[in-house]
């Protein structure tokens, strides 16, 4: 081996870069082409943006098989008379029963 110039960065050393360019092929030879190819093709690791997968739309027939749930009625819960009448009851009780 020839001595390497210490002023060069490690990624610029002779022989550190492959002689051929990287390709989109996923064969065994191309997967082991260089470290970058091995990581992306061989191991399947990519740090770029993930592409959105389009969801498969279900066939139109499958929607008819789903059971439709009845919607709950919009009745107020709690006291059916409402808060206004309750206030009136409290006022009447205080008028009829003077404690002080």
UniProtKB/Swiss-Prot annotation:
Post-translational events: Asymmetrical arginine methylation by host PRMT6 seems to diminish the transactivation capacity of Tat and affects the interaction with host CCNT1. Acetylation by EP300, CREBBP, GCN5L2/GCN5 and PCAF regulates the transactivation activity of Tat. EP300-mediated acetylation of Lys-50 promotes dissociation of Tat from the TAR RNA through the competitive binding to PCAF's bromodomain. In addition, the non-acetylated Tat's N-terminus can also interact with PCAF. PCAF-mediated acetylation of Lys-28 enhances Tat's binding to CCNT1. Lys-50 is deacetylated by SIRT1.
Renumbered ranges of motif Cell attachment site: 77-79
Binding site for Zn(2+) 2: 25, 27, 30
Stretch list, region Disordered: 1-20, 47-100
Residue numbers covered by motif Nuclear localization signal, RNA-binding (TAR), and protein transduction: 49-57
Region (Core): 38-48
Gene Ontology BP terms: DNA-templated transcription; positive regulation of transcription elongation by RNA polymerase II; positive regulation of viral transcription; symbiont-mediated perturbation of host chromatin organization; symbiont-mediated suppression of host innate immune response; symbiont-mediated suppression of host translation initiation; symbiont-mediated suppression of host type I interferon-mediated signaling pathway
Chain positions of cross-link Glycyl lysine isopeptide (Lys-Gly) (interchain with G-Cter in ubiquitin): 71
Start and end residues of each stretch annotated as Cysteine-rich: 22-37
Record-listed N6-acetyllysine modification sites: 28, 50-51
Keyword tags: Acetylation, Activator, AIDS, Apoptosis, Host cytoplasm, Host nucleus, Host-virus interaction, Inhibition of host innate immune response by virus, Inhibition of host interferon signaling pathway by virus, Interferon antiviral system evasion, Isopeptide bond, Metal-binding, Methylation, Modulation of host chromatin by virus, Modulation of host PP1 activity by virus, Phosphoprotein, RNA-binding, Secreted, Transcription, Transcription regulation, Ubl conjugation, Viral immunoevasion, Zinc
GO MF annotations, alphabetized: actinin binding; cyclin binding; metal ion binding; protein domain specific binding; protein serine/threonine phosphatase inhibitor activity; RNA-binding transcription regulator activity; trans-activation response element binding
Function, in words: Transcriptional activator that increases RNA Pol II processivity, thereby increasing the level of full-length viral transcripts. Recognizes a hairpin structure at the 5'-LTR of the nascent viral mRNAs referred to as the transactivation responsive RNA element (TAR) and recruits the cyclin T1-CDK9 complex (P-TEFb complex) that will in turn hyperphosphorylate the RNA polymerase II to allow efficient elongation. The CDK9 component of P-TEFb and other Tat-activated kinases hyperphosphorylate the C-terminus of RNA Pol II that becomes stabilized and much more processive.
Subunit structure: Interacts with host CCNT1. Associates with the P-TEFb complex composed at least of Tat, P-TEFb (CDK9 and CCNT1), TAR RNA, RNA Pol II. Recruits the HATs CREBBP, TAF1/TFIID, EP300, PCAF and GCN5L2. Interacts with host KAT5/Tip60; this interaction targets the latter to degradation. Interacts with the host deacetylase SIRT1. Interacts with host capping enzyme RNGTT; this interaction stimulates RNGTT. Binds to host KDR, and to the host integrins ITGAV/ITGB3 and ITGA5/ITGB1. Interacts with host KPNB1/importin beta-1 without previous binding to KPNA1/importin alpha-1. Interacts with EIF2AK2.
Name by which UniProt lists this protein: Protein Tat
């Amino acid at each position: 081996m020839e001595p390497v110039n210490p002023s060069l960065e490690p990624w610029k050393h002779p022989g550190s870069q492959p002689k051929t360019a990287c390709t989109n092929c996923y064969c065994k030879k191309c997967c082991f082409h260089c470290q970058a190819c091995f990581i992306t093709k061989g191991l399947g690791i990519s740090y770029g943006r993930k592409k959105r997968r389009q969801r498969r739309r279900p066939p139109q027939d499958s929607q008819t098989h789903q059971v439709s749930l009845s919607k709950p009625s919009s009745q107020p819960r709690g006291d059916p008379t409402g808060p206004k009448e309750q206030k009136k009851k409290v006022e009447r009780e205080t008028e009829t029963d003077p404690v002080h």
